[in-house]
Amino acid sequence: STLTATLTDLEDGMEYAYRVVADDFTSAEITFTTPAYPQLPNAGFEEWTTEGGGYAVAYGAGQDKFWDSGNQGAWSLKQNVTTADNTVKHSGTYSAKLESARPNMFGIGKFAAGNIFIGQYLKTDGTDGELGWGRPWTVKPKALKGYIKYKPVAISHIEGKNVPDEYVKGEMDRGIVYIAMLNDELKEYNGTKTWPVIVKTKSQEL
């Protein structure tokens, strides 16, 4: 016969032990450990530093880079589109402020959306970027929660190829949040396989 039981109110990342008792039978002790559900590194965007002479990145001293943005590309025109902000926050001291802009120098520039992503900005190709999206994660999450404040403005620039018809200059822009977990092979980039998704904005290629 099979005996089943449901245990509730267990804590994450804890070891538990149990025995089965029936009449005069007592089983050996059996142990199990509940999964630990780690937080995303720097999930509150409290830690910031600068690289490359001035572009902002969301990690602190001694930490591995988990998040990145298009700041490295925008900084070639001396502007950050993603910065630490202490005026809007849920708790702690900072939030990540994503603000679209069209940095330019001597009349040469390109529209850049404020953005932040898990992965790494890999390379600037002219006025475009190549990005590695994703980081290894070994535990299936039970929830992902966050806090967003979004203030849309009217679209001021239409640039690039294959722009969807619903994006019209003068109409209100829309913010986008993408969340994906992949069980996928790593793509090759410069002879190594590190990222599950490679984005090349010049060719709009995934």
Would you name each region that the model predicts?
Residues T2-T6:
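Short S/T/G- and acidic-enriched coil/turn segments that sit immediately N-terminal to beta-strands
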Residues K145-K149:
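Short edge beta-strand/loop segments characteristic of extracellular beta-sandwich folds
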Residues L7-M14:
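Surface-exposed, short loops/turns at beta-strand junctions within beta-sandwich domains
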Residues T138, Y150-I158, Y167-M172, E185-E188:
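Extended, low-complexity, turn-rich repeat/linker tracts enriched in Gly/Pro/Ser/Thr and Asp/Glu
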Residues V21-F25:
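Beta-strand-rich extracellular modules
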Residues T31-P141, M172-L182, E188-L206:
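Aromatic (Trp/Tyr/Phe) and Gly/Pro-enriched flexible surface segments
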Residues T26-I30:
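Acidic, Ser/Thr/Gly/Pro-rich low-complexity segments and short DxT(G/T)-type signature motifs
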